Amino acid sequence: MEQNIIELKHITKTYEDGFSAVSDFNLEVKKGEFITFLGPSGCGKTTTLRMIAGFDIPTEGEILLNGKPITELPPNERPINTVFQRYALFPHMNIYENIAFGLRQKKTPENVIVKKVRKVLELVDLEGFEKRRVDTLSGGQQQRVAIARAVVNEPQILLLDEPLGALDLKMRKEMQLELKEMHRELGITFIYVTHDQEEALTMSDKIVVMAEGKMQQIGTPEDIYNEPINAFVADFIGDSNIFNGIMTGKLKARFCGGEFVCVDDVEEGTHITAVVRPEDVILTEPAQGQIRGIVSSVIFKGMHYEITVESGKNEIVAQSVYSAKVGDRVGVHVDPDNIHIMIAEDHTNIFPAEINKNNELEYNGNVLDVALTTVIKGSRQTEDGAILDANGSEIDTGKLRIKISIKPQDIELTDVQEEGLVQGYISNLIYKGDHYSYVIHTDLEQDFVVDDEYLWNMEDQVGLLMPVEKMIFTVKK
């Protein structure tokens, strides 16, 4: 059995203001693996890396290195080195001295330093650069020096926090391949952080997809791309057509206005999310398609055309080596094994309400237009405002807990924030064929999911209009 070099057990990082950057995170990394933390900004990937390095201490949980706890161990006592996006090279030292710095701190003999520095210079293809100044190097060369300085100490684990972020596109692509080759030659464990899906797919043995401080999925690049576990992963990894639908029979699903044969055996009547990659969409003559539509957009991407087809309220994006004309009527065909079916997630929003001294329901300082006697079945209110149960006994409303639930499609967004029951900003959005699914991070530090047919922008400040008649109230004592 392969040995776990690093284990994270129920790791949580919560800051003084109550913000949870990482929540109940569990991970096992095998010796010699190249593993990548992938996710959008603010998902907790860098915080997790910093806890492995020892720069941050988890609020809860345990970190093990080769089976031994290192949660409280300071960074300098861990056999772990880190390469950051900003390489932090010493400008007053030449390349040789930059690389040798860590070895000198350890009081390594000079003859050993010479051998090790020469070896890593050869590894990063910088032989002959020993006496060069840092400011004479290109961005890619500086990045190699930073990696050489890290690996010369022979760490068991190398952490890389978006090290290619400062490079141009061509240099990034070259360095992706070079890093993968370095990993193969060194044989040490690489843990890499990026928001760039192409980097993750190109270099990794395993990818950990993160969102909002939680692991969404872990798997090989092929697993993550071909078998996303939820709509977030499908949307974040590569381009995807994502549709809500329902299973209509054995290996049959209806979505996007048509019925499709699929290979995922999900029970009939189950609400599903269907994922189809643009490269798997085949455009045909209208009569030959499973659904039909009109071409609304054609964009040349170099290696292919990106063609958008409107079918009713749905949009389907296809990639094709053949062009089309805007306004063309086309058929859309997808082979069964190119349809990925996931059981639909229940995104019902649940939040607490308070009962004020007047026995009125409040949320976020707003009185809700609903009588408490409507919420508490069988109750009635006296003239002095007391709430009595069906037996005539007074209810101590201070001991009641009221939960409100409301469906994403029943909430409306408004740019007049003060009109909303609660306010916040759009932190995530996914297009689902005939509508957008938004995550709103509110001022109360709660996330709401809202379905809306209109396109809003990331970071837009919005108010949430929530009709009382669409709310379901649950009473707990």
Language-model features, listed with the residues they occupy:
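Short coil-to-beta microelement around the adenine-binding A-loop and adjacent beta1/P-loop entry
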Residues: G18-S20
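The feature captures the beta-strand-to-loop junction immediately N-terminal to the Walker
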Residues: L38-P40
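Helix-to-loop junction immediately C-terminal to a conserved catalytic motif
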Residues: A53
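Conserved ABC transporter NBD signature motif
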Residues: G61-P69
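ABC ATPase nucleotide-binding domains
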Residues: L73-Q85, L89-F232
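Internal alpha/beta loop-helix hairpins
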Residues: T194-G258, H304, D335-N358
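Glycine/charge-rich catalytic "coupling/switch" loops of P-loop NTPases
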Residues: R254-S297, V321-N428, Y454-K477
